Amino acid sequence: MFLVVLVLIFGCAGVGYGQEPKRILSVEAFDMLNTVPDTYLVDIRTQAEYQFVGHPFKAYNYPYLLFTTTFAKDDEKPSYQLTKNKVFLEQIGKVFKKTDNLLLLDRDGTRSAQAAKELVSAGYKNAFDVYDGFEGAEFPAFDDPNKHKYYRQLAKRNNIYGFEHRRHSGWQFWGLPWTYEMDPKYVYPPDLGAPQK
């Protein structure tokens, strides 16, 4: 009887329990967009990044974080601060189904990993983290924080070409189609009014 109770407790846990988002490269995301039905590219960067840095063709903009008017030092550099978009899940739910393939793209894979986890926890079955992002990580980049810091200091000290530049990986690196054009169909719906798909 005890075994049956354990199976019921752990076997019937909430949707997404223990599940992690799938991780793919932008080139794999592009292939899915062209071959797998009900697949959508969701650019979770801020509206400013989407407009001024450019975005993939047919990428829906649903910012995971929003800029504030607070300017402060964060990590290594002073910059405008970001805050969590409190209606991110609500807005996604107005347009996309929990069974759609949602390919989440940001600048370098940092925010997309967080957003994909949040979608999985909310019951979205096919949330994908496009982990190389639109622009890719800053060069050089390492997962090990100590190694990352050491090599970045080394590159900075020696004036290595491309230091702190992106585009060594990501959507643009692969030469995938992107644009600056702002099609209202793909702009963040609250900025327009009614949701569109």
Predicted regions and their residues:
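Rhodanese-like catalytic fold shared by cysteine-dependent sulfurtransferases
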Residues: 12-35, 51-100, 110-197
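Bacterial N-terminal signal peptides
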Residues: 2-13
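Structural scaffold elements adjacent to functional motifs in cytosolic proteins
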Residues: 41-43
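Short, surface-exposed ligand- or partner-binding patches at beta-edge/loop junctions that are enriched
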Residues: 105
